[in-house]
Regions:
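Phosphate- and divalent-cation-binding pockets in alpha/beta enzyme and binding domains
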Residues: 75-77, 148-152, 196-199, 270
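Conserved interdomain hinge at the start of the Helicase C-terminal
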Residues: 56-61, 105-144
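Short, low-complexity, polybasic intrinsically disordered segments
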Residues: 8-16, 152, 267-285
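Conserved helicase motor "Helicase C" RecA-like lobe of SF1/SF2 P-loop NTPases
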Residues: 142-169
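Conserved RecA-like P-loop NTPase helicase motor core
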Residues: 107-117, 169-269
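Short secondary-structure boundary/capping segments
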Residues: 39, 79-86, 155-159, 204-207, ...
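Conserved RecA-like ASCE P-loop NTPase motor core of nucleic-acid helicases/translocases
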Residues: 66-68, 137-148, 261-262
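A contiguous, basic/glycine-rich beta-loop/short-helix subdomain that forms a polymer-engagement track
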Residues: 4-105, 110, 173, 188-192
Length: 285
């Protein structure tokens, strides 16, 4: 009996959600008709707005709205990109001392899609060196793409491969992450998928390697539009993603986690002082 009552209600909820999504899509197309320039994938259209104007009614309905992030970096640019007309910005001091989250810049190659076929060897040597220096800890290897992860993994020596869990496209991400968390051995997980939103405190991961600076993919039409629309958006977004990666280890004031960066493109980030907080700059060894 209850199933018969609940079923139409559930269907109404689903239908209401579809209607809301359709209305949002029509609003986006009215404001940004160029979004339809992106060809459909498997018969499905993906609409990615380059403004937040469609959400302004949500912002305007609030007397005060608190936006919290460790990677705002440049509040003026953040407000411009997200169409925030009036704001107050408060920066709180970092709670974790620099010595507990050191960054080691060990350039092996300038990494981009065009150089993938020739940088796998140098990057693999860098990974091997780090794992020898950290024989008793678990760690992360941020690859940014499945392609680069596979190439670097293939170039590793057999002894190093025994300590590396490779995240391949199509694998169950949750199961892989759970297996990594539960294992006691000093293994490392190589993946493009754990750069943000994951927590690796204390012995869950004491170290990490960044193979490639996480530049947005210029093959994506939306990325190109955003880059053309906002002069500093491309480097700004890259820096935000990079510092999110950096924050995966060392998660408390009594924790410790070090970071090794192998991509020479790191120099493009650190030379712009608006893109690197002083607290991070102080951690570079």
């Amino acid at each position: 009996m209850y199933d018969r009552i609940e079923e139409p209600t559930a269907r109404k909820r689903v239908l209401a959600r579809y209607i809301d999504n359709l209305q949002l899509g029509l609003t986006l197309l009215t404001e940004e008709p160029q979004l339809m320039d992106v060809p459909p994938i498997n018969g499905l259209w993906t609409l990615q707005p380059t403004t937040t104007s469609f959400a302004q009614n949500v912002i305007a309905s609030k007397k005060r709205l608190v936006i919290m992030s460790a990677t705002i970096l440049d509040p003026e640019l953040y407000a411009l990109i997200n169409n925030v007309p009036r704001y107050e910005y408060t920066k709180l001091p970092w709670q974790f001392p620099a010595y507990s989250r050191p960054i080691y810049y060990i350039p092996q190659a300038k990494v981009n899609r065009d150089t993938y076929p020739i940088v796998d060897g140098p990057l693999a040597r860098g990974v091997e060196w780090v794992l020898k220096e950290r024989p008793n800890v678990k760690g992360l290897i941020h690859s940014v793409s499945f392609d680069l992860a596979q190439r670097v993994y293939n170039a590793l020596g057999e002894d190093t491969k025994e300590r590396v869990i490779l995240h391949q496209s199509g694998m169950n991400r949750h199961q892989l992450l759970q297996a990594f968390r539960e294992v006691d051995a000093p293994v490392w997980i190589m993946s493009p998928g754990f750069g943000e939103g994951e927590d690796f405190p204390y012995d869950a991961a004491r170290s990490q390697i960044i193979l490639k600076i996480p530049y947005p993919n210029l093959g994506d039409p939306w990325v190109r539009r955003m880059r053309d629309k906002f002069k500093k958006w491309y480097l700004y977004t890259t820096a935000q993603s990079l510092w999110q990666m950096y924050g995966r280890v060392c998660r408390a004031d009594d924790d410790f986690g070090d970071t090794f960066i192998l991509d020479q493109n790191f120099e493009n980030i650190v030379k712009d002082k608006q893109l690197i907080p002083k607290e991070i700059e102080d951690a570079i060894v």
